[in-house]
Structure formats: structure tokens, C-alpha cells
């Protein structure tokens, strides 16, 4: 198979949650399980198989309600996966997120010692995720999943997080999210950016060529690795009041507050990109999925006068802005991102923290943990060398400590914000493997 050959994904073997878009509106639940008995764990997988849908079966995500199952390295061990198979997984996955925390910048209040237990501990074996466009459909699909692990003494629920779309349809900071997902070749999901070709399937699903033209390393045997992928789960607490206070202190009007927030994020609250509408929000553009992601940076905004190079959106996906830098290929560092909110919304205009826990449960999907998630987090989110600002990190989700800065290009004189505090705190996370359906059957039928 040549590097330019278009592959056909075996969608009937790929868990739907790997490629399917998040419904909108949505409600969801994440459940973590511990396997105390090997046979009970395998029995649970056999029961779960009929509940799990394959592939992005609907072009309308509002119609979908689905469940996905994922396993940690410790979970695979608990199921009795042979040592040679365990050794074939990515080293980052084997170590687990807690062991990689320092590399990821999760230290101090963001470090594993401060995480919400059992996140980041060896007790986390299985992760279930359910997303639905309605509470009724979620309850139905959750009940089907619940029957798979109840009445099994050797399987224990150890954690649960419920999520739902806020009444505004936006994230806790007030911004529309879920925009700018990469197009995956062969997935059947239409691309939202006509200026970028779809990414090779092997960037996201194991068993297919990636952007280098090679097959990514895959767990063995082939039945276990093929059509699987890696998944990163993280829970973030958001300091919404601190974010609003910072904007208020650095702006002279509500209009300037909105502009500063947009400069930090890279989009207006409606989702409209600064690159296309730099001066004022355009809700109609923000609501149009055929236009709100259809842009590049190199020709239109290379210097960041519209959308700062250090903004959150541009750090997560620099698009073509780095094409003159031969040391980096942005297409090797893309991820499928899926965020869901938890906790109550802080009422509009409130500047004081009410003490409620609110935030985002984030999922990142990709075939390469190290050069996708870990690279983006350590090199683009937590560092600014690649944009010529080595002392700056992501103004919204970076590990700022009250001394952070953020540069806003402007003619004739740039503006630099000072004293950035932390607006996001890591509450925990884990690395998972999302097996294909045949792999789940293989795991369920393992012999001791």
C-alpha cells in the first residue's frame, strides 16, 4: 500500500466512541471500574459487547447515544493478557498518566498527589463512557451497560462523573467548543476545513498507515491491536470567577473584556474564529459548521494580528502557520478532542467564586500518545519556544502561577498581559486503550 493510497476503515470493528462526534446537545457519564476477579472481568466484557456500537454510523450526531469501553494497562493485566502482549503496548501507556505527570507539567496543585482518587492509581482498570443527546436516551443506554457489570462480585464501580451541556451550550468559560476536529480519511465523517486534506487513518486508528506512510506500532497479536486506539482522559476544574476577574482588571469596558477573552482563546464566545472576524463577534459565522473552521493562518494571519500565535486554539492546532519550520509537521500532532462540562454554570456577570466544583472532562483520541497528546501538552501548551515566546504558555489552560504573560500582536505597539494566574486545575486523568470489537471478544475469551 502506498503512502497516498486511500484506505477503507473497518468501521464495523471500530468502537463508535473513537470517531463519532459528540452529540449537541448532550448528556454523558463516565464510569471507572476495578477488576478484582479475572473471570468476572472477562464475563463483563462478554456482557458489554452487545451494548457497544461500531463506527460513526450517523451523519447526525444529535441522533446518537452510545457507550464505549476502554482499558488501562493495569486493566489488561487484571484480565490476564499475556506478558508478551502487554510489553507490545506504547511505553507511555504502560507507565500510565501519573508517572508521566511531570513531563506533562502536572506538578504542584496539578500533580498526582492532589488528584481526585482513584484517578491516576493502579485501581483504575476499565473506563466506560456514555454520551447521548437526551437524558432519557442516556438512561436507557446506561442501564444496558449497567447490567453488564452488576451482579458480578469481582467487578467494582470505583468512580463516576456525570456531565451535561450547560444551558448556554458553551463551556464553563462561556465559549462554544468542539470546533476544529481533524478529518479522518476513510471515516465517512465530512471535513469542516476545505483547505486541509483529511489526515491518514493511522494517525487515529491502529492498523493503517499514518502521515509518515508507515504503520504505527501496534499491540500484539494483531487481533488485539488492529482497529484500536489510545485515549487520554482528564478532569479539569475551571476557575471561572478568576478568569472573569482577570478580564475585568485588564479591560476598560465589557466590549474590551470580550475581545481580550477572544484573543486568549482564539475565537469569540460564539465560536467565530478571530482569523475571519478579528474586530467583533459574528454569531452567525460561529454557528455555521461549514464556515467556522474553514481557514488557515499562513496567508491570512501569519503574524497573529487577528488571532495571536499564543492563543489557546492556535497552540492546540497551529494549522499551516509553522510550514516554514522544517523541524515540525503539524499533521503529526493532531488529536480528536471531545470535551464535556460538569458542575453548575456560574451565572453570567458573577465575579466571585461560589465554591462549586465545575469544569471539563476531556477526552483525546489518537494512535500516538507521545507525539500527539504528550507533544502538544509539553511543547505547545506548556511552552512558547515554537512561537518565539519561550516564557509564555497557554493563557487559558497552561500552568500559569500568577506571573504568566500573554502577548497580543498589535500595530503599532503590541500589548502584553501580565500576572496570569491559573484558570484550570488538573483533577486527574489516565491513559486508556480502546480495543476494536474483535479485540474485545478476544479479551473476553482469554484462557488462563
Description of each model-found segment:
Residues 1-448:
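Long, low-complexity, Ser/Thr/Gly/Pro-rich intrinsically disordered segments that act as flexible linkers
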Amino acid at each position: 500500500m502506498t503512502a497516498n493510497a486511500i484506505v477503507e476503515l473497518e468501521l464495523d470493528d471500530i468502537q463508535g466512541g473513537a470517531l463519532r462526534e459528540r452529540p449537541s446537545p448532550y448528556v454523558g457519564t463516565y464510569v471507572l471500574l476495578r477488576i478484582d476477579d479475572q473471570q468476572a472481568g472477562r464475563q463483563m466484557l462478554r456482557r458489554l459487547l452487545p451494548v457497544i456500537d461500531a463506527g460513526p454510523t450517523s451523519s447526525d450526531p444529535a441522533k446518537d447515544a452510545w457507550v464505549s469501553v476502554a482499558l488501562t494497562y493495569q486493566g489488561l493485566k487484571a484480565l490476564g493478557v499475556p506478558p508478551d502482549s502487554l510489553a507490545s503496548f506504547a511505553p507511555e501507556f504502560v507507565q500510565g498518566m501519573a508517572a508521566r505527570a511531570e513531563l506533562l507539567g502536572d506538578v504542584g496543585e496539578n500533580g498526582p498527589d492532589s488528584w481526585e482518587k482513584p484517578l491516576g492509581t493502579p485501581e483504575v482498570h476499565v473506563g466506560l463512557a456514555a454520551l447521548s443527546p437526551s437524558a432519557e436516551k442516556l438512561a436507557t443506554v446506561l442501564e444496558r451497560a449497567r447490567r453488564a457489570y452488576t451482579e458480578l462480585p469481582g467487578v467494582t464501580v470505583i468512580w463516576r462523573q456525570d456531565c451535561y451541556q450547560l444551558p448556554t451550550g458553551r463551556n464553563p468559560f462561556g465559549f462554544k467548543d468542539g470546533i476544529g476536529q481533524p478529518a479522518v480519511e476513510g471515516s465517512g465523517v465530512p471535513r469542516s476545513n476545505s483547505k486541509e486534506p483529511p489526515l491518514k487513518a493511522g494517525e487515529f486508528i491502529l492498523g493503517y498507515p499514518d502521515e509518515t506512510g508507515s504503520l504505527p506500532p501496534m499491540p500484539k497479536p494483531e487481533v488485539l491491536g488492529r482497529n484500536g486506539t489510545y485515549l487520554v482522559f482528564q478532569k479539569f476544574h475551571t476557575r471561572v470567577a478568576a478568569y472573569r476577574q482577570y478580564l475585568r482588571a485588564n479591560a476598560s469596558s465589557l466590549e474590551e473584556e470580550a475581545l481580550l477573552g477572544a484573543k486568549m482563546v482564539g475565537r469569540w464566545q460564539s465560536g467565530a474564529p478571530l482569523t475571519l472576524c478579528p474586530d467583533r463577534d459574528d454569531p452567525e459565522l460561529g454557528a455555521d459548521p461549514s464556515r467556522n473552521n474553514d481557514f488557515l493562518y499562513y496567508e491570512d494571519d501569519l503574524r497573529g494580528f487577528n488571532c495571536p500565535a499564543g492563543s489557546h486554539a492556535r497552540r492546540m492546532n497551529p494549522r499551516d502557520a509553522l510550514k516554514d519550520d522544517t523541524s515540525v509537521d503539524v499533521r503529526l500532532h493532531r488529536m480528536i478532542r471531545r470535551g464535556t462540562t460538569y458542575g453548575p454554570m456560574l451565572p453570567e456577570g458573577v465575579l466571585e467564586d461560589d465554591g462549586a466544583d465545575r469544569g471539563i472532562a476531556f477526552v483525546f483520541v489518537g494512535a500516538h500518545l507521545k507525539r500527539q497528546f504528550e507533544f502538544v501538552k509539553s511543547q505547545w501548551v506548556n511552552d512558547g519556544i515554537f512561537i518565539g515566546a519561550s516564557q509564555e504558555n497557554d493563557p487559558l489552560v497552561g500552568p500559569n502561577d500568577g506571573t504568566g504573560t500573554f502577548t497580543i500582536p498589535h500595530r503599532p505597539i503590541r500589548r502584553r498581559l501580565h500576572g496570569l494566574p491559573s484558570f484550570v486545575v488538573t483533577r486527574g486523568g489516565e491513559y486508556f486503550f480502546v480495543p476494536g470489537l474483535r479485540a474485545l471478544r478476544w479479551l473476553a475469551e482469554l484462557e488462563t
